[in-house]
Amino acid sequence: MTPHESLMRLALEEAGAAIREAARVLGARRLTGCTLYVTLEPCPMCAGAMVMACLDRCYFGARDARQGCCESVYALPGDPAFYHRLPCVGGLMEEEAAALLRRFFQARRSTEEGGTP
């Protein structure tokens, strides 16, 4: 498994775990009344999970021109083909979010190359 595949697998597991934990805490399968705040625009799988969980809305910082599925590449959460739709608002503290992501990936690359973060 490549480092990218490993990171994607971890991200998907964490997103699913967060939704399951929220559902457990609320005692409900649907997360109506809940708002999600994330650093990076959700990918297709995460955007689909938001729709399936019936979240009320999502705010994200940095846009993802390659995989962003809230507005950059595709607006999955607003697609009328789905029973539940939710608004997504991007660009929330965008510069800060982008800087945070850059630092995260720089540290990750440093660790993968044998350095210290």
Describe each PLM feature range:
Residues 1-16, 29, 45-117:
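Zinc-dependent deaminase
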Residues 28-41:
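Immediate flanking context of iron-sulfur cluster ligation sites
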Residues 19-26:
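Pre-active-site segment of Zn-dependent metallo-hydrolases
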